[in-house]
């Protein structure tokens, strides 16, 4: 039987979710303690928002955002430059048979939330939302 899929692709296994969360917490701690031997990276405050692992746990995509939202490119470059040391530090704390390859990308969640908030604040959208609320619940029975 085929595994059910949602609109965002195949659902993540419990192991993928657990390993992703372990990597996220450990990376957050490593970055907060400034354990990396790179003054440029240690000078940045970087939030690790989420870690998504591939189904075979060989690749971990790390979604990050520098505090304040500025210096995104510099943060990604610093993380990529120190990827080997970050993997080594992760390996010391995590007891995994294979440590995934780390890929760093900027977390777009906050930008998407801002765009949605701006869209909902527009007068034409607000008018449509208020009209839908005045019409009452839409239950599909035509009444």
Curated annotation (Swiss-Prot):
What keywords is this UniProt entry annotated with?
Cytoplasm, Ribosome biogenesis
Please tell me whether the keyword Cytoplasm is annotated for this protein.
yes
Q: Which GO terms describe its biological process?
A: maturation of SSU-rRNA
A GO-annotated cellular component: cytosol
Would I find Cell inner membrane among this entry's keywords?
A: no
Where does it reside? Cytoplasm
- Output the InterPro entries linked to this UniProt entry: KH_dom-like_a/b, RbfA, RbfA_dom_sf
Primary location recorded for the protein, binned into one broad class: cytoplasm
Molecular function terms from GO: ribosomal small subunit binding
Record text on subunit structure and interactions: Monomer. Binds 30S ribosomal subunits, but not 50S ribosomal subunits or 70S ribosomes.
Which family is this sequence assigned to? Belongs to the RbfA family.
**Functional description taken from the UniProt entry:** One of several proteins that assist in the late maturation steps of the functional core of the 30S ribosomal subunit. Associates with free 30S ribosomal subunits (but not with 30S subunits that are part of 70S ribosomes or polysomes). Required for efficient processing of 16S rRNA. May interact with the 5'-terminal helix region of 16S rRNA.
PANTHER family named in the record: RIBOSOME-BINDING FACTOR A, CHLOROPLASTIC-RELATED (PTHR33515:SF1)
Record protein name field: Ribosome-binding factor A
